[in-house]
Amino acid sequence: MDRVVRWGVLATGGIAATFAEDLRSLPGSEVVAVASRTETSARAFAERFGIPRAYGDWASLAADDEVDVVYVATPHSAHREAAALCLEAGKHVLCEKAFTLNAREAEELVKLARDRGLFLMEAMWTYCDPVVRRMTELVRDGAIGDVRTVQADFGITGPFGAGHRLRDPALGGGALLDLGVYPVSFAQLLLGEPDRVQADALLSPEGVDLHTAMLLGWSEAGASALLNCSIVADTPRTASITGTKGRIDFPPGFFHPERFVLHRPGHDPEEFTAEGSGAAGEGLRGLQFEQAEVARALRAGETESPLVPLDGSLAVMRTLDAVRDRIGVRYPADG
C-alpha cells in the first residue's frame, strides 16, 4: 500500500477525538469516515474534524470500500463486537486497550484476523512511544543487568459516581481495564507473561474494582512486579525498573514519557529522551506514534506489529483475567 492510509473511526468519545486530532499531524494518513450509534453524534464528530462521511451505524462504516483500517474506540464491552464486525468485512483494525473484556474474546479476534490475513493491533500506544522504545533497547542490551523488580502505578480520581461507565460491570468498569492495563503491559513488555499472580482490591457496591494492587512473579527469571491502579486515589503514575546492575526511573506519566533516568553504581545519573518524544508537537497527545506504526505495517504488508504483537496482547489479557479472578470481579460477558 503506497497511497494514503484511509482511516475509519468507530465511536465518537473522548479518545476518538484525541485520535482524530493526532492523526492530523501524520503525513499520508487521513480519517475518511466516522460511525456512531446515532447519526447525530457521527455528523457532529465529522463536522468537528472535517471528515467527509458520517454513519449512524457501525455496519455502514465496515462496508465502506474507501476505508482501509478502522480504529475501534468504543467502551471495552463493545470491542469484540465492533472489531469482529470490521474484520469480517475485510477491514484492518486498531482496537483500543484493554483489547477486550477477557482473554476468550481476545482469542476470538486474533483467530479471526489471522484466518483472514488482516492486520489487527491493540492500541497500546505506550509500546510505540519513542522514549519507551529507547528504554527497552537499553534493558535488552544489558544496561541494568537482569531485571529483578518492576514498579508502576496509575491512579486517578473522578468524579466517577454511580452511573458512570467506570462503575458499570456490564461496560467492563473499574480501574483494572482502564488504568491497570498500563502497568501490567509495562511489566510484561520487559518480562513477558508471569507465572504467578496475586492481587487485592477495594470493590464498589456494583462489583467493580476501585483500587487494585497486584504482585506478579516470574519464577524462571527471578523477577517480580508490584503494580497498582485506582479510580479513587491520585497516585504518582511513575515507574521504576531495577536490575542487577542498575535502575531506570520514569517520572509521572510513565505511559507517555518525555524522559527517563538511568542509575548505575559508579556513574552519574544519565537522562535519556528520544526524537519526537513527549508532546511531540504542539497540541498532540502521543497517539501519532501508534498511528504511524499501523501505517508502516500496512504499507509493508504486515498483519501484526512487532511493537505490539498479538501474542503479547493475549498474554496481558490472561493476566488481567487472573487478577480479576483473585479479586472477585466478574463481568456479564464472562458467562
Descriptions of predicted regions:
Residues 1, 185-257, 286, 294-300:
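Contiguous beta-strand/loop segments that form the cofactor/metal-binding neighborhood of enzyme cores
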Residues 1, 69-71, 296-335:
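C-terminal helix-rich "cap/oligomerization" subdomain common to oxidoreductases
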Residues 1-49, 329:
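N-terminal Rossmann-like dinucleotide-binding module
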Residues 49-111:
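Beta-loop-alpha module in the N-terminal Rossmann-like domain of NAD(P)-dependent dehydrogenases
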Residues 55, 95, 120-122, 250:
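Hydrophobic residues in well-ordered beta-strands that form the structural core
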Residues 108-126, 146-149:
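Rossmann-fold dehydrogenase core element
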Residues 126-198:
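Predominantly a Rossmann-like dinucleotide-binding segment in NAD(P)-dependent oxidoreductases
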Residues 277-292, 308:
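Active-site loop of classical SDR/Rossmann-like NAD(P)-dependent oxidoreductases
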